[in-house]
């Protein structure tokens, strides 16, 4: 019995050893294939990430260039707007100054005309008063007339 048991144990041990060797070989192949597949997946993921990074960097560069161009356009528009505003301001200041000058001229003309009109009216009134006084005064009328005529001449010379 002992020999049979020993034989069985020895054959079981041999079978187990064979099984372990087979399992180790298959496990190595399976684990190796799994590792190769995993390595390939990691490699592909890294390549994809690298490609996405390159694409993102390129898009960032493009966006920065567009931003720079936009800033330049904004600066140009602001400069043009300032120039246009200055031109418009100068135009309206010129128009206002011309209007003021015209108003001054018209006012001066109006004042001159009114002054002449008043002087004319004063002369007329003085003449009428002088004539009336001459008619009412028995004194020598030529003296009174001479006096009023000299007054008229004085006022006329003064208003010129």
UniProtKB/Swiss-Prot annotation:
<dbReference type="GO" id="GO:0009535">
    <property type="term" value="C:chloroplast thylakoid membrane"/>
</dbReference>
<keyword id="KW-0793">Thylakoid</keyword>
<keyword id="KW-0406">Ion transport</keyword>
<comment type="subunit">
    <text>F-type ATPases have 2 components, F(1) - the catalytic core - and F(0) - the membrane proton channel. F(1) has five subunits: alpha(3), beta(3), gamma(1), delta(1), epsilon(1). F(0) has four main subunits: a(1), b(1), b'(1) and c(10-14). The alpha and beta chains form an alternating ring which encloses part of the gamma chain. F(1) is attached to F(0) by a central stalk formed by the gamma and epsilon chains, while a peripheral stalk is formed by the delta, b and b' chains.</text>
</comment>
<comment type="similarity">
    <text>Belongs to the ATPase B chain family.</text>
</comment>
<dbReference type="Pfam" id="PF00430">
    <property type="entry name" value="ATP-synt_B"/>
</dbReference>
<keyword id="KW-0472">Membrane</keyword>
<keyword id="KW-0812">Transmembrane</keyword>
<feature type="transmembrane region" description="Helical">
    <location>
        <begin position="12"/>
        <end position="31"/>
    </location>
</feature>
<dbReference type="GO" id="GO:0046933">
    <property type="term" value="F:proton-transporting ATP synthase activity, rotational mechanism"/>
</dbReference>
<dbReference type="GO" id="GO:0045259">
    <property type="term" value="C:proton-transporting ATP synthase complex"/>
</dbReference>
<dbReference type="InterPro" id="IPR002146">
    <property type="entry name" value="ATP_synth_b/b'su_bac/chlpt"/>
</dbReference>
<comment type="function">
    <text>Component of the F(0) channel, it forms part of the peripheral stalk, linking F(1) to F(0).</text>
</comment>
<keyword id="KW-0934">Plastid</keyword>
<keyword id="KW-0138">CF(0)</keyword>
<keyword id="KW-0813">Transport</keyword>
<keyword id="KW-0066">ATP synthesis</keyword>
<keyword id="KW-0150">Chloroplast</keyword>
<keyword id="KW-1133">Transmembrane helix</keyword>
<protein>
    <recommendedName>
        <fullName>ATP synthase subunit b, chloroplastic</fullName>
    </recommendedName>
</protein>
<comment type="function">
    <text>F(1)F(0) ATP synthase produces ATP from ADP in the presence of a proton or sodium gradient. F-type ATPases consist of two structural domains, F(1) containing the extramembraneous catalytic core and F(0) containing the membrane proton channel, linked together by a central stalk and a peripheral stalk. During catalysis, ATP synthesis in the catalytic domain of F(1) is coupled via a rotary mechanism of the central stalk subunits to proton translocation.</text>
</comment>
<keyword id="KW-0375">Hydrogen ion transport</keyword>
């Amino acid at each position: 019995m002992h020999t049979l048991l020993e034989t069985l144990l020895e054959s079981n041990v041999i079978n187990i050893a064979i099984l372990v060797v087979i399992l180790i070989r298959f496990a190595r192949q399976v684990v190796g294939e799994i590792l190769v597949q995993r390595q390939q997946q990691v490699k592909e993921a890294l390549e994809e990430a690298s490609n996405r990074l390159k694409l993102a960097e390129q898009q960032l560069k493009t966006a920065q260039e567009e931003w720079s161009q936009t800033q330049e356009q904004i600066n140009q528009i602001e400069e043009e707007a300032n120039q246009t505003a200055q031109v418009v301001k100068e135009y309206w200041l010129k128009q206002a100054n011309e209007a003021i000058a015209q108003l001054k001229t018209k006012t001066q003309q109006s004042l001159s005309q009114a002054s002449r009109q008043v002087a004319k009216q004063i002369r007329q009134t003085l003449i009428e008063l002088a004539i009336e006084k001459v008619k009412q005064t028995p004194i020598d009328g030529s003296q009174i007339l001479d006096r009023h005529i000299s007054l008229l001449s004085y006022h006329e010379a003064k208003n010129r």
